[in-house]
Amino acid sequence: MKIIALDIGGTAVKSGLVDNGVLKEHRETPTPAAEGGQAVVALAKKLIAAYLPEGADGIGISTAGVVDSKSGSILFAEDCIRGYTGIQVKALLEDAFSLPTAVENDLNAAAVGEAAFGAGKGCKSLLCVGFGTSVGGAAVLDGRLYTG
């Protein structure tokens, strides 16, 4: 399974193509945060389109801000990306590319990744703390991402 993955942060957008769990390609591009949320989505579309010739089964987005992971919309992110709040990332990308898309908060995604593949592999619970453009944290308790 091939997944186009993007990590949208306040200063950089990291993108890559993951093929059966192996990162095959990787790019890093400055985030146009000062230009606003629509510019960030436009950059995401451009990066995704660049990977499409390789083939893809889906899109995975981790992003700064408070995210409604069910709808894939940004509930709040004004502190890091102006005008990002309210953007429905999942719907915009699914409409543009006709690929299933998942959107999650960046620290939640990092915690799940660490639990499955990284420092927390084999642990029942873990706390993941991130320091970057902003500060955040996420917890995996009894093997499940704790939200709410």
Named regions from a protein language model:
Residues 3-7, 56-60, 126-130, 138:
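Short glycine-aspartate micro-motif
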Residues 121-148:
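Glycine-rich phosphate-binding loop of actin/hexokinase-like ATP-binding domains
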